[in-house]
Amino acid sequence: MLDSNELIQQRIQKIEDLKNQGINPYPVRFFPDSKSKDIVEKFEKDPTGPETKFKLGGRLHSKRVMGKASFAHLKDSTGIIQLYATRDDLGEISYSIFKSLDLGDIIGLEGYLFKTQKGEVTLHVTSVELLAKCIRPLPVVKEKDGVIYDAFADVEQRYRMRYVDLVVNDHVRDTFITRSRIVSEIRNFLTNEGFLEVETPMMQPIAGGAAARPFVTHHNTLDMQLFLRIAPELYLKRLIVGGMDRVFELNRNFRNEGISTKHNPEFTMMEAYIAFADMNTMLDLTERLITHLAQKIHGALKIQYGKDLIDLSPPWRKITYTDIIKEYSGIDFSLITSLEEAKKKASELNVDVSKCNTIWKVADEVFSEKAEPNLIQPVFIIDYPKELSPLAKSNPDKPGYVERFEPYVAGREIGNAFTELNDPFDQKERFEDQVQQREAGDDEAFMMDEDYIRALEYGMPPTGGLGIGIDRLVMLLTDSHSIRDTILFPLMRPE
């Protein structure tokens, strides 16, 4: 068996051979007029004769040469179609080119349809043209008795070489087609709800809107430090101040943090804000949006995610932040009065809280390890501690807590929402508290944003805000178990 380097050299030689025959192996243009799936389906219903020609373009998927005649398969973006080519139809030169084709070569074909004795709709090829040589051999995926062999399955290679992954693994292509549908449906849904889609800065002088470490860059002309945005929140709320009552943005955020099955430093977020609304407005919107997406993508509200059947039917369960922690850990953090006591109880559960410097940060670690993985069915976690929510409005009926919720499904958070804090004095105090935490070593604490305070001083109406992680939502709706499976080109270490 030839190794890959020898195969590559053979294929390069075939390119040279074509050039020596005066044939351009990379022609300027070829315009298909049909897709394989469409013409097969139409032919099954209404057969056509040799007078009806079709032009197809795609990759050579398989080939079986039998002297003066050959069978092959072409794969395009819609599916696979069988090909039948003969020396008599193509002529000596073209048939020789057809026989020399390698799997993965991109070719253009013209021909008419017929059915073989086995009943398979087949393109009888009347002309063939090499459009681009597949110099590097593709992995050959074979299936026998329902078992897949030789798949391009190395996860790291798949992520690094997504272009090969998409060619070889149809389910990967399907995931990203579904992702595109989800994004389109979100835009349609929000537009129909009266939202205006806007764009806010990707480079910001102050990294705000979330507790996260930013990526830092520098603008040479202005000689100023800038941050890739960690969230668009503070700019979107400036628009609410300006009288734009319903706005949303669906775009990228960047956070200089770890990489895991749930985190990628570059990710897609949808944030929406409604003036004269509150947390409950956004809770209703979240429930309606996600059930709408499930119906559009799956045609049902019960969807399979791994071994779990998830029922998205409304209404979703609601439970407070402290109660859900107590349910899964036995600790009632609302009764704990010292950091030492909080750390002791967390340590008894083998939760590492060595870097936590407040009671509620200890609680959040316990929540992440003990409660979150168990939140399989959809649930809204409500009534978060004020300390963990610097931009949310205080709950007037529950001192020390805010009007905030996070939706959880399949063991992970998929969003964050609250009644927005619109009191500039309260907001400034919370920013100042965050600055103190930052100076104490918390590099994820918020920075002071004086301009945002100034915007609030002009008056912002009671407002509801919502953020939904698109990548995690796609994970849920495509039964994907790593965020990298929903991002075309996830960040990777250098090879």
Swiss-Prot record:
GO biological process: lysyl-tRNA aminoacylation
Binding-site residues, Mg(2+) 1: 406, 413
Keyword Magnesium: yes
Cofactor(s), names only, from the UniProt record: Mg(2+)
EC annotation from Swiss-Prot or TrEMBL: 6.1.1.6
SUPFAM superfamilies on file: Class II aaRS and biotin synthetases (SSF55681), Nucleic acid-binding proteins (SSF50249)
Protein location: Cytoplasm
Domain of life, source organism: Bacteria
Record note on cofactor: Binds 3 Mg(2+) ions per subunit.
An example Gene Ontology CC term for this record: cytosol
Alphabetized UniProt keyword annotations: Aminoacyl-tRNA synthetase, ATP-binding, Cytoplasm, Ligase, Magnesium, Metal-binding, Nucleotide-binding, Protein biosynthesis
Record-level Gene Ontology MF annotations: ATP binding; lysine-tRNA ligase activity; magnesium ion binding; tRNA binding
UniProt family annotation: Belongs to the class-II aminoacyl-tRNA synthetase family.
Subunit structure comment from the entry: Homodimer.
Protein name per its UniProtKB record: Lysine--tRNA ligase
Organism: Leptospira borgpetersenii serovar Hardjo-bovis (strain JB197)
Origin organism lineage: Bacteria, Pseudomonadati, Spirochaetota, Spirochaetia, Leptospirales
Gene label: lysS
